[in-house]
Design a protein with these regions (language model features):
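N-terminal lobe of the biotin/lipoate ligase/transferase fold
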Residues: 1-98, 165
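Residue-level signal for inorganic ion chemistry
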Residues: 15, 61, 110, 140, ...
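Active-site metal-binding loops of divalent metal-dependent hydrolases
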Residues: 38-40, 111, 141
Length: 180
């Protein structure tokens, strides 16, 4: 695996925006960089949607990688890899709690348990010639939040499913290990 750098922020507008600003200022670290946050004030989703996350309750991270071996028409593979990693981790935690809820992927970027959304991913890639120079993969997973106040139609958290708190830091490591 490539060098893995981690930046933990107590509060940020958006982890994807933070990584984008880091790229724009030339502050890129070698290898893979993961930016996590306890609180995100302007989390973004697809088509301008926002992502709600109660402070310290959920997984919020952006992973920056440099997949220059992937040609732009094949960039969907990055979304597939992240979705499969999240699906596998959530399925394991649900099964370990003795529950039988099915975790499914709604392509290209959402993870559902039953008919409720537990995770969303926003991917932003930079192209250079015929390859992808940078890819920011922002992921939000509802882990320990119990009340959702936004107008999102169907959110759910892992805690609502398994009736127990989960360790967000450990889950991030599980997802990243599977993705990388």
């Amino acid at each position: 695996m490539e060098q893995l750098n981690q930046i933990n922020l107590p509060k940020v507008d958006s982890t994807n925006t933070f990584v984008r600003d880091m790229l724009d200022s030339g502050g890129v670290l070698p290898g893979i960089t993961i930016v996590t946050a306890d609180e995100q004030t302007a989390g973004r989703g697809q088509t301008g949607n926002s992502w709600e996350s109660e402070k310290g309750k959920n997984i919020i991270f952006s992973l920056l990688c440099h997949p220059d071996f992937i040609v732009p028409p094949k960039q969907f593979i990055l979304s597939q890899c992240m979705a499969l990693a999240v699906q596998q981790v959530l399925s394991k935690h649900i099964a370990d709690a003795g529950k039988e809820d099915v975790v499914s992927i709604k392509w290209p970027n959402d993870i559902y348990v039953g008919d409720k959304k537990i995770c969303g991913t926003l991917i932003e890639c930079d192209l250079m010639g015929k390859s992808i120079s940078n890819c920011i993969i922002g992921t939000g997973i509802n882990v320990n939040q119990m009340v959702f106040t936004s107008d999102a139609p169907n959110p759910v958290s892992l805690k609502q499913i398994i009736d127990a708190d989960s360790d967000c830091d450990a889950m991030i490591r599980e997802v990243v290990d599977l993705f990388c």
